[in-house]
């Protein structure tokens, strides 16, 4: 049984904690928070042992009436691995100043740079490379989604060139500080966006073959990708079959009511998913087309949750708990109740 510590019980951290708690080969030994907010209170109510991420703030939790077991320093030595859920740039600082200092394995999230860790993780592409490693970066929600669809396409044809336009959500639903509210923003205005190089950090064979551009639009529900991939040769039926066989990809039909990201999220709600999470990415079947061996399709990414099962698989890889990535994926999916 692997002892997992969640450092940063926020948007990603709380989801990873719940996912780990559902596995039969790992357990959450504690979670940390920097301030005594409602998430800290709910962590305790869920039965997680709560620790102050910043020792000097421990008294704030006590004054707020939220019981804490101690500080990060009090629990980190008991962890086999730490999943870092800190905001962008803080993960790198934690890696250098905390995890390496204590000699504990750690996963940092996709807001950090590829060079900040030993490798970049995706369950389908880099499980073997990350096996037994000490410090790994779990790539972002967009990169995770692109890696899944590239895997499906690559399973039936060689990828010669990939062009992707990313339509990114402006902010998460709980974020009141980020926009835009009434604009479409190139993000970045330069091409390529960081997403292409990030995919290459997972799939080196796409170096020089992938180009991405991105814009932000006023929505909070999901990202969307418009994908165009030149291949060595395939057809629509092969691509649809490959998508159906690839873990954590759902094919949806606009003709069945899935005519927007709002309807996809409504589907997640109707499934009874916690926080309406959709760990799988959704590809519109009608959007799949192949013209002169070039694949076209559109997919939607739930930015808060598609990386969650990958974190669980990454734990198994780094702790050498399962050598077969597909077996880990199957085990994780079953525990989380994923469709595929």
Swiss-Prot record:
D-glyceraldehyde 3-phosphate binds at residues 140-142, 195-196. Its EC number is 1.2.1.59. It is found in: Cytoplasm. It comes from the Archaea. SMART domains: Gp_dh_N. GO terms for cellular component: cytoplasm. Pathway: Carbohydrate degradation; glycolysis; pyruvate from D-glyceraldehyde 3-phosphate: step 1/5. It holds the Pfam family DapB_N. The active site is at 141 (nucleophile). InterPro entries: DapB_N, GlycerAld/Erythrose_P_DH, GlycerAld_3-P_DH_AS, GlycerAld_3-P_DH_cat, GlycerAld_3-P_DH_NAD(P)-bd, Glyceraldehyde-3-P_DH_2_arc, NAD(P)-bd_dom_sf. NAD(+) binds at residues 11-12, 111, 169, 303. GO terms for molecular function: 4-hydroxy-tetrahydrodipicolinate reductase; glyceraldehyde-3-phosphate dehydrogenase (NAD+) (phosphorylating) activity; glyceraldehyde-3-phosphate dehydrogenase (NADP+) (phosphorylating) activity; NAD binding; NADP binding. It is an enzyme of class 1 (oxidoreductase). It catalyses: D-glyceraldehyde 3-phosphate + phosphate + NADP(+) = (2R)-3-phospho-glyceroyl phosphate + NADPH + H(+); D-glyceraldehyde 3-phosphate + phosphate + NAD(+) = (2R)-3-phospho-glyceroyl phosphate + NADH + H(+). One of its GO terms (biological process) is lysine biosynthetic process via diaminopimelate. Keywords: Cytoplasm, Glycolysis, NAD, NADP, Oxidoreductase. The keyword NADP applies. NCBIfam families: GAPDH-II_archae, PRK04207.1. Homotetramer. Belongs to the glyceraldehyde-3-phosphate dehydrogenase family. This is Glyceraldehyde-3-phosphate dehydrogenase. It comes from Methanococcus maripaludis (strain DSM 14266 / JCM 13030 / NBRC 101832 / S2 / LL).
């Amino acid at each position: 049984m692997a002892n997992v510590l969640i450092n940063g019980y926020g948007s990603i951290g709380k989801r990873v904690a719940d996912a780990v708690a559902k596995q039969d080969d790992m357990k959450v030994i504690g979670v940390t928070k920097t301030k005594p907010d409602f998430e800290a209170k709910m962590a305790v109510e869920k039965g997680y042992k709560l620790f102050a991420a910043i020792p000097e703030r421990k008294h704030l939790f006590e004054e707020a009436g939220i019981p804490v077991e101690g500080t990060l320093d009090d629990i980190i030595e008991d962890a086999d691995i730490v999943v870092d859920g800190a905001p962008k740039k803080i993960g790198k600082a934690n890696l250098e100043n905390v995890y390496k200092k204590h000699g504990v394995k750690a996963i940092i999230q996709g807001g950090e740079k590829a060079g900040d860790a030993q490798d970049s993780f995706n369950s389908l592409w880099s499980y073997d490379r990350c096996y037994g490693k000490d410090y790994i970066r779990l790539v972002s929600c967009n990169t995770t989604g692109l890696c899944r669809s590239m895997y499906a396409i690559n399973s039936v044809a060689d990828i010669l060139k990939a062009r992707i336009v990313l339509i990114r959500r402006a902010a998460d639903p709980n974020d009141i500080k980020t926009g835009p509210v009434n604009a479409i923003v190139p993000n970045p205005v330069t091409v390529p966006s960081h997403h292409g190089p990030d995919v290459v950090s997972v799939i080196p064979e796409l170096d020089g073959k992938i180009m991405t551009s991105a814009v932000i639009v006023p929505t909070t529900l999901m990202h969307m990708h418009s994908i165009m991939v030149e291949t060595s040769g395939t057809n629509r039926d092969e691509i649809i079959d490959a998508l159906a066989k690839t873990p954590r990809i759902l094919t949806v039909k606009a003709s069945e009511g899935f005519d927007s990201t709002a309807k996809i999220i409504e589907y997640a709600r109707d499934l009874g998913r916690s926080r309406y999470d959709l760990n799988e990415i959704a590809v519109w079947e009608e959007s799949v087309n192949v013209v002169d061996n070039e694949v076209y399709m559109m997919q939607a990414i739930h930015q808060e949750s598609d990386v969650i099962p990958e974190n669980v698989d990454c734990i198994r890889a780094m702790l050498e708990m399962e050598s077969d990535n597909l077996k880990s994926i199957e085990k994780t999916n079953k525990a989380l109740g994923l469709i595929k």
